[in-house]
Amino acid sequence: MTRPNNSTLKNVAFYAACFTFSVALFVALAAAGHVYPFGDNSFLTNDLKYQYIDFFAWFRRVLLGEANLRYSFSQGLGMNTWGLYSYYLASPFNLLCALFPADKLTLFIFAITALKLGCIHISSAWYVQKRFDLSKPAAFLLSLSFTFCSWTISNLRNPLWIDCLILLPICAYGCHELIRKRRMIRLVIATALNVMFCWYTAYISILFLCIFVLIEFVDYVAEKGFSWKLMLDRALRFAGAIALGLLLSAWTFLPTILAMSKGGPVLALGPLLKTSLKSVIRGFLPCMWVSNESTPQFYCGIIMMLLAVSLLVNRTVSIKTRIATLVVTIILVASSVLSPLEHIWCGMRVPNGFYSRTAFLLSFFALWAAGYTLQILKDQPKLRQAYRPAVILPLLALTAIELFANAHVVWNQLYAGYSENTNRAYVATATNTIATTT
């Protein structure tokens, strides 16, 4: 039997530290905001209270053998529930609800949210280390900024969307491998899992990957040279990888789309602009998000955003890569400002609530750009001193404090005033209703 080498143990310890730190920061946020289970402010708000808790109560009964996954009278007059399952409940984290009593479903939601944040930190740290060969402190800082970006913190009310942030870094590295090494398998598997866990956010992710893979291609040809044969080969491989991923997951998303295609608001004429310039600017700043003013959730840590912006003016980077980076950034910002672009990202439908659903893509792109910048700093003797742990660790501490403060401000708007005692009664009613109608 071979023993794990020292490098393996260090990696395990690093990823364990990423997971533990994010979970601890999440728990500290709940304690500071007096959010359940550390206070009377309920963790159930908006859709979590009025939709998800009913679904989780039903799904728990399914897992315990007390209800049928395919059919439920609790849906009204009785209907097939496969569409409900594949859209709301397909995340593997939801299997844990069977371990919680019916009256502790709020605690279950809190627990899986903590687990998901820890997994986002792990996957994004793995990505920047693999893609840019960054040191562990640098990878920790950037991945923490992505994990606790404003979009994530303000959208914990939609737990089905969060799984996408775990898989997006893996998909992105799959694009890198496809362009550089012609390998497709990672992108195929990650795409299939993304669709199976939540096809709605997977659709958004796949559209983004169609743009992101072009960035990786431009960066590659800036280094190796362009040819039409190369472009055709990589385009066919990318299309094939996405198609295979969709084929592997078709058993879950095709019935769902057919079940849900009969309803929902379709495209309609409306204002061209979704928000104001003032709100866009506020969206990039810490502690400035306002829930009722259509503020896009662009903020993802000042250090990471500054590193990302510095890529655009770094002359050691190919002008083609810098121009492509600027174009993609403009597209992602415009997607939260212009209604036609928002409709494209949302499946040609008018989204109902939860403004700026694609802002997490800009945060991830900032992660990529910041990682690219640090990779360059690491390779330049004159700038290498700024890359030392003695410099990065204090910046990491400041980033953690800054992200915590921003999240605290956001949570005070989202969770204050929602009494856990009131919501506990609602959960009990929902559980009893589900039990008597399934």
Locate predicted features:
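Hydrophobic core of alpha-helical transmembrane segments in multi-pass integral membrane proteins
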Residues: C18-A30, M305-V309, I330-A334, P394-A407, ...
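Membrane-embedded alpha-helical segments of integral membrane proteins
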Residues: N194-M196, R357-F365, K378, Q385-T438
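Periplasmic/ER-lumenal interhelical loops and adjacent helix-loop junctions
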Residues: N46-F59, G78, P92, L230, ...
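Membrane-embedded helix bundles of polyisoprenyl
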Residues: T113, L117-Y127, R131, K136-Y220, ...
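Membrane-interface coil-to-helix junctions
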Residues: A24-S124, L144-I166, I204, M260-P265, ...
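Membrane-interface junctions at the ends of membrane-embedded or membrane-associated helices
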Residues: M1-S7, K130-L134, H176-R186, E216-D233, ...
